[in-house]
Swiss-Prot record:
This is ATP synthase subunit a, chloroplastic. It comes from Cucumis sativus. The gene is atpI. Belongs to the ATPase A chain family. PROSITE patterns: ATPASE_A. GO terms for cellular component: chloroplast thylakoid membrane; plasma membrane; proton-transporting ATP synthase complex.
């Protein structure tokens, strides 16, 4: 009887733990759905920054490029190089996808350090970089998964699934598991790095004067850019792999 009661109490404790949330969150009720408002607000801000910057820089292209036009042309060339290196000669149609991923993640990561999110008061929780939330990183990783499945199926048809039994059918479970671990690694790597970076800065600011955490903030900006590049590079590599075959 005591063992049964202990088991019931243990299960109840695990159930209670499963309902715990880290921090407070603001939610909107839209129809019958509960929407995470903080992520939507910060994501809209990042999208507005990207669209506004692009429109201002290239709304009137010049034969002799302006500084803004030069910058965006350099970014485009950089994204093309990354896409071509990872995907191959058929990289062209995927440049917009890889570029969108890279720029959204890059600006999102930097917004956590450069934008004064804390000034905006919310009824519950506080604003932070979109990539500081697991919902955003999982969504980006799932989009990448859909993209490389689409790339493989559109080029090879149903024969695409033949890669799962190459080089031997014995590897079928491992090859299937690999496709599940790709979005997991993409999402948790990005989420963990951005969350850890912001937590370190917050702790240092609370413990020491403002001047001391500044080098850490610059290091965070650097690593944030690297994380955006890693995500975009891996996304392009997965797409290239699905189009060329299993490696």
């Amino acid at each position: 009887m005591n063992i049964l009661l202990c088991s019931i109490n243990t299960q109840k404790g695990l159930y209670d733990i499963s309902g715990v949330e880290v921090g407070q969150h603001l939610y909107w009720q839209i129809g019958g759905f509960q929407v995470h408002a903080q992520v939507l607000i910060t994501s809209w801000v990042v999208i507005a920054i990207l669209l506004g910057s692009a429109i201002i820089a290239v709304r009137n292209p010049q034969t002799i490029p302006t500084d803004g036009q030069n910058f965006f042309e350099y970014v485009l060339e950089f994204i093309r190089d990354v896409s071509k290196t990872q995907i191959g000669e058929e990289y062209g149609p995927w440049v917009p996808f890889i570029g969108t991923m890279f720029l959204f993640i890059f600006v999102s990561n930097w917004s956590g350090a450069l934008l004064p999110w804390k000034i905006i008061q919310l009824p519950h929780g506080e604003l932070a970089a979109p990539t500081n939330d697991i919902n955003t990183t999982v969504a980006l990783a799932l989009l990448t998964s859909v993209a490389y499945f689409y790339a493989g199926l559109s080029k090879k048809g149903l024969s695409y699934f033949g890669k799962y039994i190459q080089p031997t059918p014995i590897l079928l479970p491992i090859n299937i598991l690999e496709d599940f671990t790709k979005p997991l690694s993409l999402s948790f790597r990005l989420f963990g790095n951005i969350l850890a970076d912001e937590l370190v800065v917050v702790v240092l600011v609370s413990l020491v004067p403002l001047v001391v955490p500044i080098p850490v903030m610059f290091l965070g900006l650097f690593t944030s850019g690297i994380q955006a590049l890693i995500f975009a590079t891996l996304a392009a590599a997965y797409i290239g792999e699905s189009m060329e075959g299993h490696h």
